[in-house]
């Protein structure tokens, strides 16, 4: 058994007050144990490159796995099946990933990207990215988790990771993405790690096709602020 943890951090600079929300998974199978073992062997220099069973690892397999999952959604969309990608990260710059997302959008995949910082992708461009939305949520607290979701024909593939979709993270660092396999936990991560941010109608800035961000006033009576919701659940 191996426990893999990814921390979600809320940090208020003025008061130096930190709230840490740990997103963790206990991987209860032999192949996952071996995956973690091989990662630590690599870090200590006692093993070479080994293809892992469940974990994605930079700089070896993470990029190719991301590309393949994006392409799978595109194939499903072209076949008339439901296709969906939701991803949350701090930065999106890697050219191949961006091009694959454009191709997936042209194939009909609905893509929602929650990118806190720099994003080189342009959503809503006619003939290229009409099916892509990009939002940035910059509130009082720093959020540091990355979540990748692929509909995968109804299998709901979900990974938690340390890696932004940038060249440095995917090719020049050792980073890991691990799957959430339990259906109950998977549904909870989708709800608390992704959907809560997509529902945010008060602090989200929406990227336009020219790269400008617009904060549209909400017409809803209820103001939904994702960080307030999360603090209500996990804060003190």
Regions picked out by a protein language model, each given a short descriptive name:
Residues 2-4, 15-31:
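Short, small-residue-biased leader/transition segments that mark boundaries at the very start
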Residues 5, 41-45, 199:
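Non-catalytic alpha-helical coupling and interface elements of nucleotide-dependent molecular machines
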Residues 8-9, 14:
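Polybasic, lysine-rich low-complexity intrinsically disordered segments
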Residues 30-45:
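Mobile "lid/hinge" segments at catalytic clefts and subdomain interfaces of large enzymes
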Residues 33, 55-56:
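Internal, active-site/partner-interface "lid" segment
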Residues 47-51, 59-236:
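PLD/PLD-like phosphodiesterase catalytic module centered on the HKD motif
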């Amino acid at each position: 058994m191996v426990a893999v943890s990814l921390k979600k951090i809320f940090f208020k600079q003025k008061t130096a007050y930190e709230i840490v929300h740990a997103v963790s998974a206990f991987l209860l199978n032999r192949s996952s144990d071996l995956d973690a073992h091989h990662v630590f062997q690599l870090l200590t220099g006692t093993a070479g490159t080994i293809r892992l069973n469940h974990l994605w690892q930079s700089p070896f397999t993470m990029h190719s796995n991301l590309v393949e999952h994006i392409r799978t959604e595109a194939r499903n969309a072209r076949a008339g099946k439901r296709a969906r990608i939701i991803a949350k990260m701090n930065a999106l710059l890697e050219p191949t990933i961006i091009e694959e997302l454009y191709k997936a959008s042209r194939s009909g995949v609905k893509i929602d990207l929650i990118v806190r910082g720099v994003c080189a992708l342009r959503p809503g461009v006619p003939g290229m990215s009409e099916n892509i939305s990009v939002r940035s949520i910059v509130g009082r607290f720093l959020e540091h988790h990355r979540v990748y979701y692929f509909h995968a024909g109804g299998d709901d593939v979900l990974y938690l990771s340390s890696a932004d979709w940038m060249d440095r993270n995917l090719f020049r660092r050792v980073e890991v993405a691990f799957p959430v396999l339990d259906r109950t936990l998977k549904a909870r991560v989708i709800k608390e790690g992704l959907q809560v941010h997509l529902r945010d109608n008060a602090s989200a800035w929406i990227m336009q096709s020219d790269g400008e961000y617009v904060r549209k006033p909400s017409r809803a009576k209820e103001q939904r602020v994702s960080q307030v919701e999360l603090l209500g659940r996990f804060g003190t």
